[in-house]
């Protein structure tokens, strides 16, 4: 014979819907995915364009990496879309002017895209910056997490956000592989 306590342990719990805890978990996943995306951008951008004196090339690269690490996602996207990913016809161009005395070097690696693909990627990345900023700075202002319906709406928005940043991360990973292959070919 079983008592009521045993029955409660073995019977399935009815779906209680979306909770604030579910939303918090998904929010954390979104933020972590955005950080992974940002770190991948930093890894690419820190080394795609390097200029300096050939007397101290390691110092130049260290400085470039340090400068890149301090940039926000918005600045990184701006850098990526003006110097790493470029539309056909603008390859080899760089806004950066380096004035050095003596022997110097400049290394610039770019991925050239058809104009329509460049425009699509640029719009997607600008939208990602806006989405990330909205999540980080306004999520609680825009969502009511005190009700099940509010949590459900927040969860749906986070699922869409996670899907978008995951697709962007996967696309950027593909570009990073192209970058690594080109770097290896040059070395």
Q: PLM features: residue spans?
A:
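Flexible secondary-structure boundary motifs
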Residues: 53-123, 130, 134-143
